[in-house]
Amino acid sequence: MTKQPEDWLDDVPGDDIEDEDDEIIWVSKSEIKRDAEELKRLGAEIVDLGKNALDKIPLDADLRAAIELAQRIKMEGRRRQLQLIGKMLRQRDVEPIRQALDKLKNRHNQQVVLFHKLENLRDRLIDQGDDAIAEVLNLWPDADRQQLRTRIRNAKKEKEGNKPPKSARQIFQYLRELAENEG
């Protein structure tokens, strides 16, 4: 057996390139699995969206076809299809998809908050009457005062008579129309 010289390691090709900026980042297998699972969950969120919401997310043709297929499949086949969608997402830039999905969620959350505010305003209209009507007219100057008073009066009668809250629903719908016409 021949003995190699001590400097044999110095002759490795490509070893003369010394760049400290090229650090190798090691990723654990567990982290890779967590990332894959997170992309699978993202795919499941996209699959659960309706057609109108799906149109607002930037997807290429292959991914969109896989998502539409997953929407039609049930049980075990759906699980396998979600794994395929997760795999497809790993090969793509998912940041635009995440941003579009967050935008959709945020729009839904804003709508829920608006509905809660309108419900509270409706309840105040029924309980307080003219004071709350003044608040509505400050928010929406084109609101019909007479229509509000009539509906409030009917809502109070329904509440006292333990009848279904038909007028209260009408007040809410009217307030929602005012809010939508404003924005």
UniProtKB/Swiss-Prot annotation:
Q: Which domain of life is it from?
A: Bacteria
Paired cysteines (S-S): none
Q: Which CDD domains match?
A: YjgA-like (cd16331)
One GO MF term = ribosome binding
Task: Give UniProt keywords alphabetically.
Answer: Cytoplasm, Ribosome biogenesis, RNA-binding, rRNA-binding
What does the protein in this record do? Member of a network of 50S ribosomal subunit biogenesis factors which assembles along the 30S-50S interface, preventing incorrect 23S rRNA structures from forming. Promotes peptidyl transferase center (PTC) maturation.
Protein name stated in the entry = Dual-action ribosomal maturation protein DarP
* Localization per Swiss-Prot or TrEMBL: Cytoplasm
Say which species the protein is native to.
Answer: Escherichia coli O7:K1 (strain IAI39 / ExPEC)
Q: What is its main location?
A: cytoplasm
GO biological process terms held by the UniProt record: assembly of large subunit precursor of preribosome
User: Its family?
Assistant: Belongs to the DarP family.
